[in-house]
């Protein structure tokens, strides 16, 4: 009798396990999508909470340009999210940067490709460009705002010293909302 019970269990176990694996995979994809949505919201708010110095734009009508190094799908999602919105009266212009030299023409750059961090930071050194990346090591490398996960939440850390070195002014809202403020 016990053998029959085990055989019946084995009959539903494999399909149930397959269903659980499929649901978990969908949950992982959903988590990644929701993390991208939060990243988009963070980037939009970073643009609002930083002050750029006079002369940061080529003209009074120039757009607010956001460059993405790596993560083209995130760039597309950001472009859709900010369509019809502006920051400081300026429309958004979204660019995928294949060459890091294009970063100097942006007001904000998101580095989604770890191998490019040093090159982008060198290209924008001393220029009024907000540089956002991922992971705590990003700040240690000279980045300005680093996104990272804390459990299921996406959080950010701020390096105000790097921000002010770029002649930008971090707003109080930015530093208060950060998980931590490092480097000055």
Give the role of each language-model region.
Residues 2-19, 26-184:
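Short hydrophobic alpha-helices and adjacent helix-cap/hinge residues
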């Amino acid at each position: 009798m016990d053998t029959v019970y085990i055989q019946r269990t084995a009959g539903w176990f494999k399909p149930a396990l397959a269903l659980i694996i499929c649901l978990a995979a969908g949950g992982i994809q959903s988590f990644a999508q929701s993390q991208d949505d939060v990243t988009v919201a963070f980037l939009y708010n970073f643009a609002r909470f930083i002050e750029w110095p006079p002369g940061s734009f080529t003209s009074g009508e120039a757009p607010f340009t956001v460059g993405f190094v790596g993560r083209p799908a995130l760039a597309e999602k950001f472009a859709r999210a900010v369509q019809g919105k502006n920051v400081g009266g300026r429309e958004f212009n979204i660019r995928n940067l294949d060459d890091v030299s294009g970063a100097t023409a942006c007001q904000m750059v998101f580095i989604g490709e770890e191998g490019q961090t040093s090159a982008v930071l060198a290209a924008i050194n001393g220029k009024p460009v907000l540089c956002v990346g991922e992971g705590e090591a990003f700040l240690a490398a000279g980045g300005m705002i680093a996104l990272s996960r804390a459990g299921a939440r996406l959080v950010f850390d701020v390096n105000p010293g790097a921000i002010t070195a770029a002649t930008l002014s971090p707003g109080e809202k930015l530093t208060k909302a950060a998980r931590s403020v490092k480097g000055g």
